Structure formats: C-alpha cells, structure tokens
C-alpha cells in the first residue's frame, strides 16, 4: 500500500505517468484471484493509472528474445546445478553465491540459464538511499535468468518489461534494493537505458518485522479507504492536516498531490505505521 501511494504521488508530482503492471510469470506461486483483488483495492482507494493494465505474461516473446540475445553474445550459459549440488557453496546477503560450476560446460538434459557476471562493481545513486555499489561476482555470482522449469526469472522479466514500457523512474520498497544491481547489470548487457531508482523504507510492526503475509498481516480493507489513505500519508511523513481525517478521497488526494515531498524519507530504511489498521495490513500493493 505504501509503495503504491508513494510511487503514484511521485509520478504525478513530476508530471509523469503511473503505469500498472501485474507480475504473473510464476503460476505455481500465484493465488487465484489475487490480481483482481489488487486491482479492486487500487480502484477503491482512488488510484488512477495511465493506459491499460499490462500483464507480464503477455511479454513472454520479448523475454525469450532477450534470453536469445544474451546467449548469442556469450553472456549467458546453461546450468544443471541443483540445490543439492550447491548445498556447500558459499552464501552471502543475497543467498547462495554461485561458484561458476557450469561456466565451462553443462551436460545436463534439463538446465537453467545463468547470466555471466564479473568483478566490476555495479553502482547507482538512489534518490533516498544515496550511492550504492555491489560486486555481483562476489555477492551473488552468475544468476538465473531462465529457470529449469521453463519459467522466466523475475530479474530478467522486470528489466525487459520496464524497457518495453519506457520506464524512466522506479519507486519501490527498500526490500527490493538488493535486486537493483542485478537489474542494472542486465540493462547494461542488453543495451537498455537505466531508470532512476528510489527505494522507500518498508513498514514494520512493533517487533521489527516487515509487514507481510508471513507475519500475519491482512488484506487491504475496502470499507475505509479514506482513513487508510490518511494513515498512509502520515506514515510516509507527509503530515496531512487533522481536518483531512474526515474528508473524502478526492480531497485527501488533492492535498497529497499539492504537498507531496518524498525527501522527508531521506535515508530511512524502516517506518512504523501510524494506524493499527494499517499495521495489520499486508504489503500486497507494494
């Protein structure tokens, strides 16, 4: 919810478009009806997106073309390693650091595809979190772009789709910042422009846990959008006037658009929701 509010307001404040894309490339993990629930909630809260809703699964041909380009350029290779094979591999903040086992050769019948990394740091300047650097070779190793089960990996899909849609600015939760260097690396290999990145702090509960389904948070309520939007603005440090707490959605959005200032979140990584109801809400719109 917070990332949706922040990205929407930031796009509008800069005179840009706010595009809505459903990431539906992992059917085994998708819950039936989840996408429709999110769209219903966004509409209920008064979000207005530009153009039609797009679905990541509709871009499969473009994803495959990107994979083909990486293979033809010698930037990707087949990998037959299983989780068991990598059980003794070193681990870092991003998980297993792939040791390059299949770089030279892979004889497996079924294989994933990994993209080559090197020892150069990938860097970017985040609008809120400042300068960031990551050496992919030592922190993640060569990473998967096409899974053994035939599905496209998220890192590649989101990069291709951002390129297809002409995305220039990305505002999202800081829990996704570790993915950014891998996405920038793919942009460089594929010759894509790199968007400007802005990672907002994630909401946590009173135990310091990120709000998520795994920690018992609930769906975004549809019966009190005004109250929840007001609380979201407070949580994002925007200080809406008290009288807006009893105002309609249109008035709350109008104030938010006039007064939006994302820089009040500068360098923050965690925030605690102002409203108990918001603290109990899952981060499903981020």
Where are these predicted regions, by residue range?
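Noncatalytic linker/hinge segments flanking ATPase motor cores
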Residues: 59-64, 155-156, 160, 200-201, ...
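Non-catalytic terminal extensions that flank enzyme cores
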Residues: 13, 107, 120, 209-286
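Active-site cores that bind ATP or allylic diphosphates and position pyrophosphate for catalysis
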Residues: 78, 83-222, 240, 277-286
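Bulky hydrophobic/aromatic packing residues
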Residues: 4, 8, 18-19, 25, ...
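N-terminal Rossmann-like or analogous alpha/beta NTP/dinucleotide-binding catalytic cores
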Residues: 1-91, 174-175, 179-192, 244-249, ...
